[in-house]
């Protein structure tokens, strides 16, 4: 069958781009329809800072009957295309297609050709045009599970399409999961936590919204100590920390955000949010006033979200390896034991295999198991060039790295 490709250039085209997955996944119960505006905002120069130094283009594919059967986007960021890369590298993403090899290859071709015309020599995919904590990677394991909010879900046949075209694994991203009922930590971990709890210098507690200013500064302090030891990681300023917290504030549950203190100084944090995918699927991408009211009711009143989404955690270097990570998890468990929280499971996403220290820490001290796997692929336009996988996250100095997860914007590859 022959296909016609069309550049997205009108409001009607954009609606086709947004609505295609709704048709492809209508019989897939695990898939959760994202908010239309979440996708639309990625390609809006007024709302996506990546356009300050880059460009993006989208295509639709139509069959002989005029039915939309595929889509793809390609993009590049001039500021970061060479960062930690041996060649200028762009990206492709938001790929969707019926199960047809010819169609998939046509979409990959048009993305590759456009990127090459703009000076790129490789493309990563499927990725986001912006932050790595959304729409990044191809699901290759865990199809039976519902995705976390803004995490990709796709059918199994996509893996074959990417790999047969010539994409190679640049890095893997693991999602870990664990129950949060009593007794889900190992005996060794409970013993470590008990030793800390017996020392009055240590304290573990959830935040209070009235103390948000103190939380912002504590978060920034720990983050900068925990992550400044990694190459390529910038210090977080107050404006960035405040912006992050203000973004999360509407959905924050203070009993999902924990800090560890030593002599009243912050030494660790663990930030979770309610996983919105538990309640937004029924909205079919729409978020008008009625759905906003339903959303608030389900989240704040009915408390229908039973899954916590671990966004990021960190421990200062001098406290790493002492059980502080487990202490914060145990504080959360104790809150769950009171019976006032609806959460029964915790998932931690975007833990890259380029950071084996973090993987070991999550498995050993958080007692979480691998639950899903996504792959970030890379395709080199020069097919004779040697392919190299993403290098492990390097340290600036000899101290052991602080625990942190998923910190999606601090990997050794760059945002495209």
Sequence positions of predicted segments:
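Acyltransferase donor/substrate-recognition loop-hinge adjacent to the catalytic core
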Residues: 3, 152-232
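Acyl-donor binding region in acyl/amide transferases
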Residues: 80-166, 283-365
């Amino acid at each position: 069958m022959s296909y016609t490709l069309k550049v997205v250039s009108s409001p009607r085209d954009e609606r086709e781009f947004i609505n295609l997955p709704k048709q492809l996944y209508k019989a897939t119960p695990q898939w959760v329809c994202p908010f239309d505006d979440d996708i639309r905002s990625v390609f809006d120069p007024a709302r996506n800072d990546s356009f300050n130094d880059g460009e993006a283009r989208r295509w639709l594919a139509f069959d002989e009957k005029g039915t939309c059967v595929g889509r793809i986007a390609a993009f590049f960021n001039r500021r970061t295309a060479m960062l930690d890369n041996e060649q200028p590298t762009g990206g492709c993403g938001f790929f969707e297609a019926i199960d047809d090899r010819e169609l998939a290859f046509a979409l990959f071709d048009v993305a590759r050709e456009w990127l090459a015309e703009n000076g790129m020599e490789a493309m990563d995919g499927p990725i986001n045009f912006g932050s790595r904590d959304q729409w990044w990677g191809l699901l290759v394991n865990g199809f039976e599970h519902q995705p976390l909010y803004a995490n990709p879900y796709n059918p199994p046949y996509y893996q074959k399409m990417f790999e047969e075209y010539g994409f190679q694994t640049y890095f893997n991203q693991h999602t870990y999961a664990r129950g949060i009922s009593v007794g889900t930590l190992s005996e060794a971990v409970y013993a470590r936590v008990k030793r800390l709890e017996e020392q009055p210098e240590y304290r573990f507690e959830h935040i209070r919204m009235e103390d948000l200013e103190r939380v912002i500064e504590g978060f920034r302090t720990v983050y900068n100590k925990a992550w400044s030891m990694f190459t390529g990681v910038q210090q977080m300023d107050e404006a960035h920390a405040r912006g992050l917290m203000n973004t999360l504030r509407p959905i924050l549950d203070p009993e999902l955000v924990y800090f560890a203190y030593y002599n009243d100084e912050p030494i660790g944090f663990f930030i979770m949010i309610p996983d919105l995918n538990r309640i937004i699927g029924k909205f079919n991408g729409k978020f008008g006033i009625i759905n906003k009211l339903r959303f608030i009711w389900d989240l704040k009143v009915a408390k229908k979200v039973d899954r916590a989404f671990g966004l990021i955690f960190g421990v200062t270097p001098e406290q790493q390896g002492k059980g502080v990570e487990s202490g914060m998890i145990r504080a959360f468990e104790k809150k769950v034991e009171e019976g006032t929280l609806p959460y029964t499971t915790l998932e931690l996403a975007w833990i890259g295999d380029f950071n084996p220290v973090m993987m070991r820490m999550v498995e050993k001290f958080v007692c979480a198991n691998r639950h899903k796997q996504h792959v970030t692929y890379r395709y080199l336009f020069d097919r004779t060039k040697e392919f190299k996988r993403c290098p492990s996250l390097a340290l600036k100095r000899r101290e052991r790295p602080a625990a942190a997860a998923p910190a999606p914007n601090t990997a050794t590859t760059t945002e495209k």
